[in-house]
């Protein structure tokens, strides 16, 4: 009992409560979504008897993953994050040993396990499926990347602006991005890029490199649209980008009306769902709702807007913003730069996922399969999030410097 009291005294209680609040609200909202489907429970068509939890399964999995994740986070917070960085060969071998097979193996079943599983209607085969549960190893590899990149930055912190060292850092960053891109998961690849940029910025990367990189990226995008738009490709990813720029297809980017309607349908329905909720929403378990494809996943914010309105969205995003700020603040108060870089990476990941997901739901960014942290359905992603929470708490608990002292 004394140990629990001492832990509670040392840990970041507010950070933990923000995470628990987010997970609780996610489970309630997913239960609401299941209810509104009209078949939350699985029912026998002949007898009408309830035979299973049906769509409520997502809420149950989300809640179970949150409880398990919280336990892992509490355990992880008791371990000094420096010791986790030191065993980098172990977690690099494990995580990337899981990431690489789907590059060469697609939809291959070995007993109950499927390697290279496609969890949607895209070209992304980076998943594993085991006994009905899916897992994306790039989420676990993201944590390993943050730890190893933080170690790399810590080792070269006084030489980060030397071209030779910067080139090595960029190779460290671009290698996993390239692998994930080849797997067809550009959304996750973009998140990795933002994580790396946040960590290098925290390490003191010169503004001349930052401004130069932004200018080069802008020029590359402009050139792609101006000179190579007809050669880049006509796949769904390119169409999704063009759908944001020209949603009415006035330039004729879609080859036919069916393709145009299919590409814009999800975001169009998401906009309608958010708008229909008004200020206070249509009610969590009562009232009308608008069907949105993947409303339980990438477009969960549109569901929250539908049932809880503008106020509900503000509460959800406000709590997530507080989590991001607290993560960066923990890094700022770290006694060593290693802890600062880890928190910068985790804070950057949260910030990027929130910003991209909100942009997708509001139709200001293309749909690239980025979920809303804590809220979008997915047990493995919730578990990975809580591992990140554990790392942030570890930095908090194993440092004593005041943020302003």
Question: Could you describe each region identified by the protein language model?
Answer:
Residues 190, 195-209, 285-312, 370-385:
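Interfacial segments of multi-pass membrane proteins
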Residues 182, 186, 190, 281, ...:
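Hydrophobic alpha-helical segments of membrane proteins
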Residues 112, 118-127, 212-315, 337-339:
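Hydrophobic, glycine- and aromatic-enriched re-entrant/interface helices and adjoining loop segments
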């Amino acid at each position: 009992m004394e140990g629990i009291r001492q832990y509670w005294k040392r840990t970041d209680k507010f950070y933990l409560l923000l995470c628990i609040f987010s997970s609780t609200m996610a489970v309630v909202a997913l239960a609401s979504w299941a209810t509104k489907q009209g078949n939350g429970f699985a029912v026998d068509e002949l007898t009408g008897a309830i035979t299973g939890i049906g769509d409520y399964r997502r809420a149950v999995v989300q809640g179970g993953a949150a409880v398990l994740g919280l336990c892992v986070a509490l355990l992880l917070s008791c371990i000094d994050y420096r010791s986790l960085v030191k065993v980098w060969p172990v977690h690099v071998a494990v995580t990337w040993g899981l990431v690489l097979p789907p590059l060469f193996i697609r939809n291959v079943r070995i007993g109950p396990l499927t390697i290279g599983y496609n969890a949607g209607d895209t070209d992304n085969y980076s998943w594993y499926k085991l006994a009905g549960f899916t897992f994306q190893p790039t989420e676990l590899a993201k944590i390993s990347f943050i730890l190893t990149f933080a170690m790399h930055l810590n080792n070269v912190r006084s030489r980060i602006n030397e071209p030779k060292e910067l080139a090595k850092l960029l190779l460290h960053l671009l290698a996993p991005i390239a692998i994930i891109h080849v797997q067809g998961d550009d959304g996750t690849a973009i998140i990795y890029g933002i994580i790396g940029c946040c960590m290098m910025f925290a390490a003191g990367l010169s503004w001349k490199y930052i401004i130069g990189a932004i200018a080069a990226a802008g020029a590359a995008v402009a050139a792609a649209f101006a000179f190579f738009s007809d050669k880049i490709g006509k796949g769904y990813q390119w169409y999704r980008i063009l759908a944001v720029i020209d949603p009415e297809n006035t330039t004729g980017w879609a080859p036919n009306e069916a393709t145009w309607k299919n590409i814009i349908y999800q975001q169009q329905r998401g906009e309608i769902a958010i708008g229909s909720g008004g200020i206070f929403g249509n009610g969590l378990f009562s009232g009308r709702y608008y069907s949105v494809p993947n409303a339980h996943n990438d477009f969960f914010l549109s569901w929250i807007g539908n049932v809880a309105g503008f106020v509900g969205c503000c509460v959800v995003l406000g709590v997530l913003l507080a989590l991001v700020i607290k993560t960066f603040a923990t890094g700022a108060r770290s006694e060593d730069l290693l802890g600062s870089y880890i928190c910068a990476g985790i804070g950057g990941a949260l910030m990027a996922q929130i910003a991209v997901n909100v942009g997708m739901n509001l139709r200001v960014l293309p749909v690239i399969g980025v979920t809303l942290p804590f809220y979008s359905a997915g047990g493995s992603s919730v578990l990975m999030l809580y591992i990140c929470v554990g790392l942030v708490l570890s930095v908090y608990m194993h440092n004593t410097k005041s943020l302003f002292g």
